[in-house]
């Protein structure tokens, strides 16, 4: 008997044949598409459940009215919304679910207590102890914007950020000597590590050069060797086939990455802490009277017909500033994509300035830097703090920032940048 049974079960059945030993499912008593899963609850009243009679006896009453039947009490069940069908209770047992209390953030106090939402939604204030140079520079920036967004808040009563260019007082004898840095020359030996040393590998019958790290085939010809030039004082390496593009001023990306839009550039680590929150630059009327006109290059001076328009406060009526010039729009907080774009511009500018800093005079370098920022500023985006801070501290990516000691000088990692 046992044998025939097993043979019967394991026999290959034809697709149209009914499987005898699998019980037929009752109808789905629980179908809520919003719920994480489907639960199948087999009703206990035969295969096709009859509607429960409303009149007359419903059968024996359960011993535990209002309570779940004994079979559920020892288990913790994730029950569907309408509970489980229980034969003993003649119906559905709906578990009593404790309602989760919604978290209410503390309300705003009239005295100016700030909830976390306020902190997240209000623009950050730049907290830098202003030096005369940084104030002058901030005023230059204010004047220079053709579509001027006005005043940058320099708040003195707030805790200042650590200026990353402050000289650190460190005993000279504890510091190791730093050799004087020479600008890179063409094909400098110091940059040899930048050309990845390729290794011969046999692939099939061919011997090819392979980069030992990334394991990919080199485009370098075995006979001619590496064709690349060091193009600037930072020891940047450009391969020969990319040189025309480099000369045209394109940013040369390495094609090693599948995603082309991802840059190689990494932001420079900074001493001190800058907030990454976007900084909104508010508008102010009196910008052009502040800086002396002689100190500002002529192309930075605001033209008379476009002067900065004060921002409308919330409580002011719109009639106060009736005729806004057509370029005027309040500063928006940027999206992530815009932020990345601005960051790319920033980093590109940073690298260009870095490359130029042995070749041009510091003042021109600084002006170029600020002008480069005006290009971004006119695009009407909110700056993140780490971008605007170097502007306000009156610094540029100049030789001091990149920690290159001067001739016979030993110095710590954070240095003064003279504005």
UniProtKB/Swiss-Prot annotation:
Superkingdom of origin organism: Viruses
Composition bias, Basic residues: 1-27
InterPro entries: SatRNA_48 (IPR035312)
Region annotated Disordered, chain positions: 1-66
Pfam families: SatRNA_48
Stated family: Belongs to the nepovirus satellite RNA 48 kDa protein family.
Name of the protein described by the UniProt record: Satellite RNA 48 kDa protein
Species: Tomato black ring virus (strain E)
């Amino acid at each position: 008997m046992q044998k025939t049974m097993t043979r019967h079960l394991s026999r290959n059945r034809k697709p149209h044949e009914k499987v005898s030993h699998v019980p037929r499912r009752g109808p789905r008593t629980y179908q809520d598409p919003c719920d994480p899963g489907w639960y199948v609850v087999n009703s206990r009243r035969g295969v096709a459940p009859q509607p429960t009679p409303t009149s007359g006896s419903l059968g024996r009453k359960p011993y535990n009215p209002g309570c779940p039947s004994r079979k559920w009490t020892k288990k913790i069940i994730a029950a569907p919304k309408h509970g489980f069908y229980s034969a003993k209770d003649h119906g559905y047992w709906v578990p009593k679910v404790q309602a989760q209390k919604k978290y209410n953030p503390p309300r705003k106090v009239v005295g100016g207590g700030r909830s976390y939402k306020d902190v997240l939604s209000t623009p950050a204030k730049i907290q830098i102890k202003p030096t005369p140079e940084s104030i002058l520079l901030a005023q230059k920036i204010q004047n220079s914007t053709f579509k001027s967004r006005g005043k940058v808040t320099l708040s003195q009563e707030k805790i200042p950020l650590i200026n990353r260019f402050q000289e650190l007082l460190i005993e000279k004898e504890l510091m190791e000597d730093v050799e004087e840095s020479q600008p890179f020359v063409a094909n400098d030996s110091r940059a040899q590590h930048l050309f990845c040393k390729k290794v011969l590998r046999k692939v099939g019958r061919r011997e090819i050069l392979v980069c030992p790290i990334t394991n990919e085939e080199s485009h370098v010809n075995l006979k001619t060797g590496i064709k690349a030039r060091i193009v600037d004082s930072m020891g940047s390496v450009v391969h020969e086939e990319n040189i025309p593009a480099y000369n045209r001023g394109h940013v040369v990306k390495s094609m090693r990455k599948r995603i082309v839009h991802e840059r190689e550039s990494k932001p420079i680590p900074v001493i001190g802490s800058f907030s990454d929150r976007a900084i909104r630059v508010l508008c102010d009327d009196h910008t052009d009277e502040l800086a002396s006109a002689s100190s500002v290059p002529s192309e930075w001076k605001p033209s008379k017909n476009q002067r900065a328009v004060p921002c409308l406060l919330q409580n002011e009526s719109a009639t106060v500033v009736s005729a806004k010039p057509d370029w005027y729009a309040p500063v928006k907080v940027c999206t992530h994509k815009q932020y990345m774009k601005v960051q790319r511009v920033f980093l590109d500018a940073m690298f260009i300035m870095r490359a130029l800093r042995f070749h041009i005079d510091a003042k021109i370098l600084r002006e170029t830097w600020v002008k480069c920022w005006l290009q971004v500023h006119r695009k009407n985006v909110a700056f993140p703090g780490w971008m605007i801070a170097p502007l306000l501290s009156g610094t540029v990516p100049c030789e001091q920032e990149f920690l290159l000691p001067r001739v016979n000088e030993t110095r710590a990692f954070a240095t003064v940048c003279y504005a």
